[in-house]
């Protein structure tokens, strides 16, 4: 398995903590803050995991917004991509975890892996749901932090083969 680039953007530190947990679980990964990342660095990986919190009512976190603006769909074309979104299903029930939707729109030019069921979450709507599943792993550190480690472990097992 080639080295995996785990890119995150964060305001509160939650996304960085999740990126570190995923790195520990999956192994052979480099964790990179998108606030300090370059397009060249991103393009140095063929396997990436993108960890993005949702800002406000369905927006992409600012560092991610800036970094994503430097990337084209073609930058994702030959990559295997796992998406991890953070959100608050109670406060933002109608736009839950939509931050990863904005990344997914470009990332789907590559091979996106790791879609997960919406079971166990309580929300009204989310653009991050396609075909009845989330486009990646979704974490709610505000309301279901007790499920985070289990969700990460299951997701890593699910995607490990795709990153081999």
From Swiss-Prot:
Cofactor(s) needed: FMN
- Record bears the keyword Electron transport: yes
Which molecular function GO terms apply here?
Answer: FMN binding
Q: Carries keyword Transport?
A: yes
Q: Which UniProt keywords apply?
A: Electron transport, Flavoprotein, FMN, Transport
Tell me the leader sequence span: none
**Which residues are in the Flavodoxin-like domain?**
4-160
Protein origin, superkingdom: Bacteria
Q: Which InterPro entries match?
A: Flavodoxin, Flavodoxin/NO_synth, Flavodoxin_lc, Flavoprotein-like_sf
Q: Name one Pfam family in it.
A: Flavodoxin_1
Any idea what job this protein has?
A: Low-potential electron donor to a number of redox enzymes.
Tell me which PANTHER family the record gives.
FLAVODOXIN 1, FLAVODOXIN 2
Q: Belongs to which family?
A: Belongs to the flavodoxin family.
- The protein here is known as Flavodoxin
What is the source species?
Answer: Helicobacter pylori (strain J99 / ATCC 700824) (Campylobacter pylori J99)
């Amino acid at each position: 398995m080639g080295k995996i680039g785990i890119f995150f953007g964060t305001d509160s530190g939650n996304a960085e903590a999740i990126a570190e947990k995923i790195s520990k679980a999956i192994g052979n990964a480099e964790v990179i803050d998108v606030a300090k990342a370059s397009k060249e660095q991103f393009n140095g990986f063929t396997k990436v995991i993108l960890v993005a919190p949702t800002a406000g009512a369905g927006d992409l976190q600012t560092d991610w917004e800036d970094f994503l603006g430097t990337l084209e769909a073609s930058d994702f074309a030959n990559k295997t991509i796992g998406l991890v979104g953070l959100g608050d299903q109670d406060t933002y029930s109608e736009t839950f975890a939509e931050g990863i939707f904005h990344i997914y729109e470009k990332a789907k030019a590559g091979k996106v892996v790791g879609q997960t069921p919406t079971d166990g979450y309580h929300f009204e709507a989310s653009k991050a749901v396609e075909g009845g599943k989330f486009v990646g792993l979704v974490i709610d550190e505000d309301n279901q932090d007790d499920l985070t480690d289990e969700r990460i472990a299951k997701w890593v097992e699910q995607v490990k083969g795709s990153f081999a």
